Amino acid sequence: FPVGKPNDAYAKYFIGQSWLAPLTTKQVPTHNVTFEPRCRNNWHIHHAEKGGGQMLICVYGRGWVQLEGEPAHELKAGEVFNIPPNVKHWHGAAKDSWFQHLSLEVPGEGTSNEWLEPVTDEVYDKLP
């Protein structure tokens, strides 16, 4: 998958450099997102009145996804993680690895994204 362009439009919601490659915006919007080591996005929520949520498919490297109140889950190439709608979460690269995932927006009604606070170094550095 293409790496895409620097993710400048959303840089304020990331710690570190990421790149974004839109693959399709029809039916199920899908993007390839690439993270340099230690890069992660802020906590955020994919809101939906009905349906919605997000699916991550790791295609390269190693990264993390964490739902609020749960332990972080390691993602490796070929693994899929489903994020339910209306759940606060974050995702990003491992400390020592690049990370690339496909991000699929699950269709729904009344969908919107809410960006929240950064994942601090204190929280991130506790990951193995």
Language-model region placement:
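Short, charged/polar surface micro-motifs in flexible loops or helix N-caps
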Residues: 26-28, 35-40, 60-64, 109
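A short, N-terminal "cap"/entry segment at the start of jelly-roll beta-barrel domains
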Residues: 1-29, 42, 112-128
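Ligand-binding loop in jelly-roll beta-barrel domains
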Residues: 64, 72, 77, 85-113
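Conserved short histidine dyad/triad with adjacent acidic residue
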Residues: 17-19, 31-50
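A short beta-strand-loop-beta hairpin characteristic of the jelly-roll/cupin
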Residues: 40, 50-77, 87
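Conserved hydrophobic/aromatic beta-strand scaffold that supports enzyme active sites
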Residues: 20-22, 30-34, 55, 72, ...
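Glyoxalase I/VOC metalloenzyme domain signal
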Residues: 3-4, 36-38, 84
